[in-house]
Structures are given as C-alpha cells and as structure tokens.
Amino acid sequence: MKVALTGGGTGGHLSIAKALAIELEKQGVEAIYLGSTYGQDKEWFEDSPLFSECYFFNTQGVVNKSFFKKIGSLFLQAKAALKAKEILKKHQITHTISVGGFSAGPASFASLLNKIPLYIHEQNAIKGSLNRYLSPKAKAVFSSYAFKDKGNHIVTSYPVQNVFFDHARTRTEIKHILFIGGSQGAKAINEFALFNAPKLTKQGIEITHICGPNSYERVRFFYQELGLLDKIVLFAFHNNIIEVMQKADLCVSRAGASSVWELCANGLPTIFIPYPFASNNHQYHNVLEFEKENLCYVVPQNELLPKKLFEVIRKLNQKDEQGHKNLTIISNKLQQKIAKDGAKTIIERILSA
C-alpha cells in the first residue's frame, strides 16, 4: 500500500495535506507528494520527512485568467499529468488523495488514467472548480460541510492537526488580540489593526500582528510613526501559528477554511473578514454556519470601520443571566463544535475501502 498526496498552492490546502501526511506516517503508510513549483508547495514540502519523494510540476491555475493564459495553463496541466501518470506507475501507488487547489490537477487526472482510486478533501463550503469536475469521478469526497449533491460525499471532522486541540483553552478575558493578515498580507486587516492599535495599547491590551511578507516594511513603518513599535509584536510570517494563537483571547482573520477550523479547535473567538473576491464568495460561506450559531462575528470588508472592533469587544464582555461572559460561552462552544482526529478518520476510511 502506497499513497500519493496532491494539491496545495496556498496554506489552507497545504495544512490539510500535512495533517493527512502525519496520519499516514503514524499508520506506517509510505506517501509521496505531487505539487507545483508555483505557490507555496515547495516551501512546505520540498525537504519534508513526511514523504519518501516529492515532485513539483511547472503548473499554474486556470481560474480568473484571460482566454490565452487559460490555454497556456491547461497545456502545462496536461503536460504535467502525463509526467504524473508515469510517476504514479513507477511508485506503484494504490491510493491518491487530493486536497484541492490547482496543483492537484495533474496527479488527480493521472490517477483516473491509471485507474487508481481517487479520494478528495474539499475544504470549503463551496467547491472549487477542479473538485466540482472531479467529485463524480472520485471514490469518495470528504468535507466538513454538507453538500446538496450527496452522492459519494462523507461528512467528517475537519483534519486539523492535534496541536491546535492540545493547546486549546477557554478564554475568560480579552487581554491579547491576534490580527492575521495572512501570507498574502490582507491590506484591510492590516489597516484595521493599525487604526485600532493606539486605543488598544492605551487600554493595556496586547497585540500580535502577522501582516504578510509583502506588507511588513510598510506596516512596521506605520507602527513606528505611531510610536507603538516597541509595544506590539509584529511578524511578517509565522511558521508556528499555534504559538501565537494560544496566547490570544480574540482574533481578527480572513475566513479560509483551515484558519476557521484551527481557530475553532483552539477555542479562540474570532472576528472574520471574508476575502470579498474569493471564488463563489466561499470564505463567507465557510463561516455562515458559525455565524448562525453565534460562534463568531462576521464583518464584510466594506463595513470594516475601526469602531467595529470595540463593538465586538463590548458584546463579548456582556454576560448572560447566569453571569457567564459571551467570550467564555463562545470559546467553550467552539471547542465542542469540532472533534479531534479528523485526519485519522479520513485516512482510516480510505485505507479500509
């Protein structure tokens, strides 16, 4: 038995791949990885001990491109699929697991050509274009969201790494706020943090701000101009997100699925600002259920005024009839919403099929 893991491009897809790879290693199953030279795949897995071999193809996404660029991208995908076909055959792969993203294309199509069972994990509440096409052809599609086209879909707990559960805690007071601008550096969140920093620090609330590599110098300059550089903790990027997450009592973040469920597992109440240009507005749909259950606060980017933060803080500090803070109630309920060992459940279902 030998498994090929494929897909990525962004941290959300790659964090799932990592969680599944860790579980495969625990179960003594050898795995290889097939991704792209474009995006973050190499950064995550090029030297990873989780895989016996890693392959990175010259591929790019097709979505949101002009007609001629789409043709070029499809040509690269087809060329890579032929290479992937030979790689899967060479390694005698018995199962292929796709975590989605454009870099999953070549190995997924190669698996179908080689008649290797294909399993898909769909991370978002709205399927990506590749997964929409491949889902009917897959042996099973795993997701933490229930889709209308049930068919071969299996609802499981999100494959969050155990470290997020292990460092979970119930929040009782807002002493520390974490702003996550993401690897791309969300300008709206970065500016939201900068606007609110003077008042927050004046109130004695600590700030950790991950602003993204491309925004680091600009954001650092503005904190310096505000005279706050020595009063906040600023990162361009952080390799160990749980280290900063566990210290925080409130988070401000985009609504990528992996971030949503990692924050949930850690019991960290969050203000989500969904990326408004995400395909099919999937970031908003990722947190829609959470919002309906009063487990988070969702603020559209075009309504992100500085005062929103303090409105949410006031709501979180309010108490119910039993004297429990909303902050604590939400933190407890978040930890109950997601079960541990999502990756283990998925891998066991695949290996026993």
From Swiss-Prot:
One term of GO molecular function: undecaprenyldiphospho-muramoylpentapeptide beta-N-acetylglucosaminyltransferase activity
Binding site for UDP-N-acetyl-alpha-D-glucosamine: T10, G11, G12, N124, S183, Q283
Pathway entry: Cell wall biogenesis; peptidoglycan biosynthesis
Enzyme Commission code: 2.4.1.227
Gene Ontology CC annotations of this record: plasma membrane
GO biological process: carbohydrate metabolic process; cell division; cell wall organization; lipid glycosylation; peptidoglycan biosynthetic process; regulation of cell shape
Highest taxon listed in the record's lineage: Bacteria
Main location: membrane
Pfam families: Glyco_tran_28_C, Glyco_transf_28
Membrane topology annotation: Peripheral membrane protein
Places the protein is found: Cell inner membrane
UniProt family annotation: Belongs to the glycosyltransferase 28 family. MurG subfamily.
PANTHER family per the UniProt record, alphabetical: GLYCOSYLTRANSFERASE, UDP-N-ACETYLGLUCOSAMINE--N-ACETYLMURAMYL-(PENTAPEPTIDE) PYROPHOSPHORYL-UNDECAPRENOL N-ACETYLGLUCOSAMINE TRANSFERASE 1
Role of this protein: Cell wall formation. Catalyzes the transfer of a GlcNAc subunit on undecaprenyl-pyrophosphoryl-MurNAc-pentapeptide (lipid intermediate I) to form undecaprenyl-pyrophosphoryl-MurNAc-(pentapeptide)GlcNAc (lipid intermediate II).
Protein name in UniProt: UDP-N-acetylglucosamine--N-acetylmuramyl-(pentapeptide) pyrophosphoryl-undecaprenol N-acetylglucosamine transferase
Species of provenance: Helicobacter acinonychis (strain Sheeba)
